[in-house]
């Protein structure tokens, strides 16, 4: 089994990588993993999580290994990784919710459940339904009209404090 963490420093209101990298290392050590058992990547641009996930899934498949990926970011980072591993039966994707919307988390559980690294590393896989659209893969919601316009504009405003 191979493990990969994809961290998006641009997701949410603040960069999650500073606090999360040491937490991941500590949780991995508690799980009995060596540093060679897992990889942590920080995404650098839109689409990077998809590229990293696809490359890792291909490499694991060629080696006959399974791959478990966790994304730390928002729904966009999660969906990039889901799209990247699409078609690879050896790969599973988990979500650490550090984005601004986190629709996936609200659909399937609570923030406490999803941010518990020990539980995430020890947990099993759960199959969910996804929907393929002309614009990509969806695991929670597809919207048109006002909802879509609001979602499209969020990157411009996500780090502006509301109060």
Pin down the residues of each PLM region.
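Helix N-cap/beta->alpha junction signal
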Residues: 45, 73-74, 143
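Short Gly/Thr/Asp-enriched flexible loops that form oxyanion-binding sites at enzyme active sites
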Residues: 77-89
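A residue-level signal for conserved active-site and pocket-lining positions in enzyme catalytic cores
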Residues: 8, 49, 75, 131, ...
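A short, flexible low-complexity segment enriched in Lys/Arg and Gly/Pro that occurs
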Residues: 71-79, 119-122
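Short glycine-/acidic-enriched loop or helix-start segments at secondary-structure transitions
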Residues: 15-16, 80-82, 105-107
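ATP/NTP phosphate-donor binding region
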Residues: 1-69
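Catalytic core of DAGKc-family lipid kinases
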Residues: 86-163
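Glycine-rich beta-strand-to-loop/alpha-helix junction loops that act as flexible
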Residues: 9, 72-74, 96-98
């Amino acid at each position: 089994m191979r493990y990969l963490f994809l961290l998006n420093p641009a997701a949410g209101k603040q960069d999650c990588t500073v606090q999360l990298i040491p937490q991941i290392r500590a949780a991995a050590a508690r799980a009995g993993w060596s540093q060679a058992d897992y990889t942590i990547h920080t995404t650098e641009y839109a689409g990077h999580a998809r590229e990293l996930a696809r490359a890792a899934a291909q490499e694991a498949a060629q080696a006959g290994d399974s791959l478990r990926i966790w994304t730390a970011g928002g729904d966009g980072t999660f969906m990039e990784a889901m799209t990247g591993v699409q078609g690879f039966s050896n790969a599973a994707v988990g979500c650490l919710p550090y984005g601004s919307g986190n629709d996936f988390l609200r659909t399937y559980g609570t923030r406490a459940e999803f941010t518990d690294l020990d539980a995430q590393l020890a947990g099993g896989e759960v199959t969910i339904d996804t929907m393929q659209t002309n614009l990509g893969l969806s695991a929670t919601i597809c919207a048109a009209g006002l909802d879509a316009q609001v979602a499209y504009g969020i990157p411009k405003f996500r780090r502006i404090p509301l109060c």
